[in-house]
C-alpha cells in the first residue's frame, strides 16, 4: 500500500515564503540584535558589496527580500524538476525560509543576496550534473559558483579544501576531480591575475583570503541563541537526522542518482555547519546552510509518517514565528 504524503499547495508555501521574507527583513532592519549587526570580515567582493549597501541601505534590504523569495522558490522546485524524491514535494521552500532567515539573521543584506544567488546557481548546476547530464560543463559551472563564495564570505575559504574531497567521495573519478579543482580555483586565479596586472603581487589576494579566514569577528554563535532559537534548531536537526537516516537505509525507493545528490548535500551541510567553528564566522553562514538543508530535508516529509512530519513542521513554524517576535524585543 502506498504511503500517504501530505501535498502542500504551491500557493500556500509561496505566500509563506513571502511573509517570512518581508517579516524577517523588516525585523532585522528595524530591531537588529547584536549578533546580527556584526559585520562580515572584508573580502575582495564582500567589501565592495558592503560599500554599496552603505549608499543604498533601503534598496539593499528590498533586494535581499526579493532574492530570498526567488531562490527559495527555485531550490524548492529542484526536487520536482529533477525527480530527487520518491514522491512530489516542494517542502524545500519553507525549510529554506526558516533556516535562512528565522534562526539568526544579518543586516548585511547585499552580501546575503549575492551569497544566496550564487549558492542557488551552484546547487542547481550540481543537481543537474548528477541527475541529468553528467557533463563536465555542469560540474565546472557548479564548482565555479562555489569558488566565488570565499571571495564574498571569509569563512567559506575552507571550501577550497573540502569541496574536492566531497566531489571525490560522491564521484570517484580523477577526471571529475580535476575539473572540479580547476573550476573551483578559477575565480581566485582571476582575482590574483587582475591584481598582478594592476601592479601588485600575484599571490596577494590569496594571502588576504587566508588571513581573512583567521581574522576574529565579533560574532559569538552561542551568545546569539535564545531558548526558542535552540528549540527551532533542535527541530531542524531532528528533520535532518531523519532524512539522512532514510538516505542511508532506504535503498529501494530512492534512485541511485538521487542518493548521490542527497549524500553530497548532506556532506556539504556538515562542512558548512563546521564553518561556525572558525574565528571569522558570522550569522551570514545560515544562508549558505539553508540550501543543502532544503535539498535533504524534503525526503523526511515523503518517507516518514504524516502525523509525525506534520507535527514537527507546525512546531517548526510556531518556533520560527515566536523567535522572530522575541528577537524584536
What are these regions (language model features)?
Residues 121-137:
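Membrane-interface transmembrane helices that cradle and orient dolichyl/undecaprenyl
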Residues 138-152:
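Membrane-interface alpha helices of multi-pass inner-membrane proteins
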Residues 39-55, 206-230, 242-246:
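Juxtamembrane membrane-water interface segments that cap and precede transmembrane helices
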Residues 63-74, 115-118:
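Transmembrane alpha-helices of multi-pass, membrane-embedded glycan-processing enzymes
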Residues 159-185:
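Perimembrane helix-loop-helix junctions
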Residues 75, 79-99, 117:
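Transmembrane-helix signature of polytopic, membrane-embedded enzymes
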Residues 93-113, 125:
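Aromatic- and kink-enriched transmembrane "portal" helix at the membrane-lumen/periplasm boundary
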Residues 245-305:
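Membrane-water interface signatures at transmembrane helix termini and the short loops
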Amino acid at each position: 500500500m502506498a504511503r500517504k504524503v501530505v501535498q502542500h499547495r504551491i500557493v500556500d508555501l509561496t505566500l509563506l515564503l513571502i511573509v517570512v521574507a518581508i517579516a524577517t527583513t523588516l525585523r532585522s532592519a528595524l530591531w537588529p540584535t547584536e549578533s546580527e549587526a556584526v559585520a562580515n570580515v572584508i573580502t575582495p567582493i564582500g567589501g565592495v558589496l558592503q560599500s554599496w549597501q552603505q549608499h543604498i541601505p533601503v534598496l539593499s534590504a528590498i533586494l535581499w527580500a526579493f532574492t530570498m523569495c526567488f531562490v527559495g522558490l527555485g531550490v524548492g522546485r529542484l526536487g520536482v524538476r529533477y525527480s530527487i524524491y520518491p514522491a512530489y514535494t516542494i517542502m524545500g521552500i519553507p525549510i529554506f525560509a526558516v533556516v535562512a532567515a528565522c534562526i539568526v539573521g544579518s543586516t548585511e543584506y547585499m552580501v546575503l543576496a549575492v551569497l544566496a544567488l550564487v549558492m542557488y546557481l551552484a546547487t542547481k548546476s550540481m543537481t543537474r550534473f548528477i541527475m541529468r547530464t553528467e557533463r563536465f560543463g555542469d560540474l565546472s559551472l557548479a564548482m565555479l559558483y562555489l569558488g566565488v563564495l570565499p571571495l564574498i564570505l571569509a569563512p567559506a575559504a575552507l571550501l577550497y579544501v573540502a569541496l574536492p574531497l566531497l566531489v571525490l567521495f560522491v564521484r570517484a573519478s580523477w577526471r571529475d576531480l580535476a575539473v572540479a579543482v580547476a573550476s573551483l580555483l578559477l575565480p581566485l586565479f582571476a582575482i590574483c591575475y587582475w591584481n598582478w596586472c594592476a601592479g601588485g603581487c600575484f599571490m596577494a589576494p590569496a594571502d588576504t583570503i587566508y588571513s581573512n579566514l583567521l581574522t576574529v569577528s565579533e560574532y559569538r554563535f552561542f551568545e546569539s541563541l535564545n531558548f526558542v532559537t535552540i528549540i527551532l534548531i533542535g527541530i531542524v536537526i531532528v528533520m535532518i537526522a531523519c532524512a539522512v537516516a532514510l538516505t542511508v537505509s532506504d535503498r529501494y525507493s530512492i534512485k541511485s542518482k538521487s542518493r548521490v545528490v542527497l549524500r553530497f548535500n548532506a556532506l556539504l551541510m556538515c562542512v558548512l555547519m563546521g564553518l561556525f567553528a572558525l574565528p571569522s564566522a558570522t550569522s551570514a553562514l545560515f544562508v549558505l546552510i539553508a540550501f543543502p538543508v532544503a535539498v535533504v530535508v524534503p525526503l523526511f516529509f515523503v518517507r516518514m509518517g504524516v502525523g509525525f512530519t506534520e507535527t514537527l513542521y507546525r512546531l517548526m513554524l510556531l518556533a520560527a514565528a515566536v523567535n522572530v517576535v522575541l528577537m524584536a524585543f
